[in-house]
Amino acid sequence: MGKDYFEADVMAETMRRSKLGSLSQGSRVNLERALSLQTRLGGHIVSGHIDGTGTITRMEREDNAVWVTVTAEPTVLKYIIEKGSITIDGISLTVAYVDDTCFRVSIIPHTAEETTLLTQKAGDTVNLECDMLGKYVERLLHFEQTTEEQTSKIAITSSYLAEHGFL
């Protein structure tokens, strides 16, 4: 680590899921300290684990805000809900609109000034991180369904015992 730089290891998984491989030396990125147990929570919980990428399709100013529209794959969009959280390039934002192909967020002046988001343009790729809660719920429901299916397949009932000569 130096006065104006730091080094970090990057895993192949990060390269596959993110736009990191398309950045060049000197590219600006958004960095934030990790949350500690003493930290006051004042916003969305962001883990830094990228779920995939999206493409900015539109940026338009409205009064003091900028609307940003992003398209993404269904595997990412399924976790995005209106008024829920989405992280774009490490910036935690609230979703204003979502449909089957895209979502929209509104960038307030403070976010515009303190992050790199408005240096992007239509056609640029952005990293996306969805709210973790939706992924946990989906996983839990999958396991509940799988467990029920497995239990019904191997349940020992009186008819099972009779079919196999035990009654």
Write out the residue ranges for each language-model feature.
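Conserved loop->alpha-helix
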Residues: M1-L167
